[in-house]
Amino acid sequence: MKTTFLEFEQPIAELEAKIEELRFVQDDSAVDISEEISRLAAKSQQLTKDLYATLSPWQVAQIARHPQRPYTLDYVREIFTDFHELHGDRTFADDLSIVGGLARFNGQPCMVIGHQKGRDTKERALRNFGMSKPEGYRKAKRLMELADKFGLPIFTFVDTPGAFPGIEAEERGQSEAIGHNLFVMAGLKVPLIATIIGEGGSGGALAIAVGDSVIMLQFATYAVISPEGCASILWKTAEKAPEAAEALGLTAHRLKALGLIDKIVNEPLGGAHRDPKAMATMLKRALAESLRQFQGMKTSELQARRHERLMAYGKFKETGSN
């Protein structure tokens, strides 16, 4: 698949276009221009390194939303075996913005749950752009409870702009569904490893992310609101999104410094979409390390750690009154 370049990557896009042009000429020419192609390829790689070494939070947010970025089912195919998808919340409907099912991780039975976006217009609409409704979160809760019943570790993958804000979602109890998930996750007797693979949007992300270990990919984001939404509230214009992204502290390194996530998994040069297989290999290693850390831990300790993490989200400091 041809790489789609973001706006800030245009200098790289121009170099890559030139390289492709020269390769096309090379195929039909007796003149050897391989040395020039190699020179431009090295220049493109160095430019990518330089650009990605100084990314702003707003640029990171754009990478997290990249249309070619691996989604949950891509990681399921690369990391797990024997995946069998389970459907429906047994109450209302089957929300396709959340996928989940039984699988094996390094031969061990487990439960996998995650947000799923679409690759084309039809699939994006079918999966509601990764914005889950109450029935999606209730499906996730059902699968978590099933895993808990059979003693299976749970792996969740977060990639959502946020919970769906439509009227019908509110009518069916969106906030109750999210809140109930937090309650259930806090009390699970099995390890839960959560990974932010793209966008981690507010309560819609947290609803499947109260884990014993929270992993975040290098160019993923995690925040209480999107930069555009924040800018629209504070400055009354979405054009201030870059400033909002800076203020939100949504990048992996910022969140790790704040103690809100546990581990950062580096991405291939140019982002996970440049080499999905390499990304999956690195993530699988991190998941295995996290699972080893918590497997065999006493239930009471798992629950206490999770409750402590949940209570640590959002703090305030008394400054005195006038």
UniProtKB/Swiss-Prot annotation:
Q: Which HAMAP family match?
A: AcetylCoA_CT_alpha (MF_00823)
GO biological process: what's one of them? fatty acid biosynthetic process
- The residues forming a coiled coil are none
Q: What is known about what this protein does?
A: Component of the acetyl coenzyme A carboxylase (ACC) complex. First, biotin carboxylase catalyzes the carboxylation of biotin on its carrier protein (BCCP) and then the CO(2) group is transferred by the carboxyltransferase to acetyl-CoA to form malonyl-CoA.
Name of the molecule in the record = Acetyl-coenzyme A carboxylase carboxyl transferase subunit alpha
Superkingdom of this protein's organism: Bacteria
The gene it comes from is accA
Metabolic or biological pathway, per its Swiss-Prot or TrEMBL entry: Lipid metabolism; malonyl-CoA biosynthesis; malonyl-CoA from acetyl-CoA: step 1/1
Is Nucleotide-binding found in the keyword set? yes
- Protein family (similarity comment): Belongs to the AccA family.
Give one GO term, molecular function aspect. carboxyl- or carbamoyltransferase activity
- The UniProt record lists the EC number as 2.1.3.15
A GO CC annotation given for this chain: acetyl-CoA carboxylase complex
Quickly give the catalysed reaction: N(6)-carboxybiotinyl-L-lysyl-[protein] + acetyl-CoA = N(6)-biotinyl-L-lysyl-[protein] + malonyl-CoA
Xref: PROSITE patterns: COA_CT_CTER (PS50989)
Q: Where in the cell is it found?
A: Cytoplasm
